Amino acid sequence: MVRLVLPNPGLDTRILSLAELETIEQEEASSRPKWDNKAQYLLTCVGFCVGLGNVWRFPYLCQSHGGGAFMIPFLILLVLEGIPLLHLEFAIGQRLRRGSLGVWSSIHPALKGVGLTSMLVSFVVGLYYNTIISWIMWYLFNSFQEPLPWSECPLNENQTGYVDECARSSPVDYFWYRETLNISTSISDSGSIQWRMLLCLACAWSVLYMCTIRGIETTGKVVYITSTLPYVVLTIFLIRGLTLKGATKGIIYLFTPNVTELANPVTWLDAGAQVFFSFSLAFGGLISFSSYNSVHNNCERDSVIVSIINGFTSVYVAIVIYSIIGFRATQRYDDCFSTNILTLINGFDLPEGNVTQENFVEMQRQCNASNPAAYAQLVFQTCDINSFLSEGVEGTGLAFIVFTEAITKMPVSPLWSVLFFIMLFCLGLSSMFGNMEGVVVPLQDLKVIPPKWPKELLTGLICLGTFLIGFIFTLNSGQYWLSLLDSYAVSIPLLIIAFCEMFSVVYVYGVDRFNKDIEFMIGHKPNIFWQVTWRVVSPLLMLIILVFFFVVQVSQELTYSIWNPGYEEFPKSQKISHPNWVYAVVVIVAGVPSLTIPSYAIYKLIRNCCQKPGDRQGLVSTLSTASMNGDLKY
């Protein structure tokens, strides 16, 4: 076993000893929040981990990388990468009883940048994640009507036909791009604020504030609904989906394995990235949540339970999604065939009912033989069920276009629409609880807010400030900004944070010390699996994924898809290059958080080198006192 531990002077003065830990827990029982029960804690963690990405990212990756074959690297990396880091975050938060900023500052003052980066990433993700929730609320509000507003095109101003943009695309496309986003044709064309979206964004932040106003005291009550209702809705959709025509075709298509994909490095890279992001690791929220546990809570068992639920949910959601996609593909296949049948009937004046899907090819042959010239004038569509099933859609396109189109073809469509968007709302809201925790707690640890200010005020100021910045997402170009942040702002920083977390605990805090801490908390030392993954396997996997991600993102040109009615292949999305100034934006939103970690470490090094020996001794004494009083200031 690797036993390298880097020098870390003063560590014992910055953290509580195991003997003092239980005493401090009793003393802070009245001042520090704690969970009402174990179920409340687990539901909160599950709600934070299981988010919108499980709904619209995992099914797409399965479909793109060999169906059932993708499950193999996903499950392997879930065990070797996801569970070990989850256990580490649970254990270190429970042991040091602080948020992310306090935890890493306690381990080493130079690691404060890790906590700061987690806070910045949580802030950026919350910034655009709640915008998605506002879109979900807009669709939810519009679901309480019959027919659904995206089921048919609106009439033009003269009432003589449909709006041209809708007629050339589809009702679901038109409602999403024009009625909802009123999207521009470029990220440079900002346009104006869409007031309906602004009101929905205000509602989203207001709901989040009410749910997080007192931290876990309020979120702990809400998660009983937000973390369980999605599973109820998913089960209802699965039962309904399996009764729809073509549902099994979608499920079979999803899980039909293409084992050749296992030899594709991109498949393993995407599986590793999906495991990492689906656990919401490195945001700091899980560390804060675990810090509210009892000292002797079994964090090892918690990490396994949450991991199993998360992995099961990803697969379960994929089955539900593709049962509906199978139904949608079958409907489109039937519509395509009906159009071809109608073309053949009209071209040869055949009696209705004489041509069916079963005899269509034979009737084509007969018509071609009887009048080749007339047959040559007919234009038939290509109807292939696999092509409809293979239309890989992820992200907002899956939720707001593909699924909404499928819902319009279901009986009692408003009911299914309401259920679907309530489910998405709960998934998004419960994930935002963790993001808010990852911002509020570090700000409290930084002491930038006067201690006399109540937590309700701090939470309100954060929600208000983020809401004001979120105005950019209500512009005509808002969707492009959101996609930009989602694609480039958080991936690299999160991977860097996760690697630093694992390295810091194992080689700065010391894995042997960590093992003793866990033995004290749960009654036994971590077994050989945890030792191997923490010391070697998990850091190596994260480093490989980080390097690959960095190489891919740096080497590729920044492009994005736009909705352009003037595009010659409309309604297909047009892919264009980002303007040059976007590169500067990407460097700022991705580079600043990433560079915070080494920058703060260098700052501490320079500061320590410039201090006089007497000042250093005084600093150690101060840190020791602050550590015992629970008031670390670095």
UniProtKB/Swiss-Prot annotation:
GO terms assigned for molecular function: neutral L-amino acid transmembrane transporter activity; symporter activity
Residues on Extracellular side: 63-65, 142-192, 243-268, 326-413, 478-487, 553-581
Main localization category: membrane
Entry-annotated residues carrying Phosphoserine: 17, 627
TM stretches of this protein: 42-62, 66-86, 121-141, 193-213, 222-242, 269-289, 305-325, 414-434, 457-477, 488-508, 532-552, 582-602
One BP annotation, GO: sodium ion transmembrane transport
UniProt feature coiled coil, ranges: none
Reactions accelerated catalytically: L-alanine(in) + Na(+)(in) = L-alanine(out) + Na(+)(out); L-cysteine(in) + Na(+)(in) = L-cysteine(out) + Na(+)(out); L-glutamine(in) + Na(+)(in) = L-glutamine(out) + Na(+)(out); glycine(in) + Na(+)(in) = glycine(out) + Na(+)(out)
Alphabetized UniProt keyword annotations: Amino-acid transport, Glycoprotein, Membrane, Phosphoprotein, Symport, Transmembrane, Transmembrane helix, Transport
Membrane-protein topology: Multi-pass membrane protein
GO cellular component terms given for this protein: apical plasma membrane; brush border membrane
Cytoplasmic topological segments: 1-41, 87-120, 214-221, 290-304, 435-456, 509-531, 603-634
Pfam family, one: SNF
Glycosylation sites: 158, 182, 258, 354, 368
Keyword Transmembrane helix in record: yes
Localisation per UniProt entry: Membrane
Family: Belongs to the sodium:neurotransmitter symporter (SNF) (TC 2.A.22) family. SLC6A19 subfamily.
Biological role: Transporter that mediates resorption of neutral amino acids across the apical membrane of renal and intestinal epithelial cells. This uptake is sodium-dependent and chloride-independent. Requires CLTRN in kidney or ACE2 in intestine for cell surface expression and amino acid transporter activity.
NCBIfam families the UniProt entry points to: Na_transp (NF037979)
Protein name per UniProt: Sodium-dependent neutral amino acid transporter B(0)AT1
Lineage: Eukaryota, Metazoa, Chordata, Craniata, Vertebrata
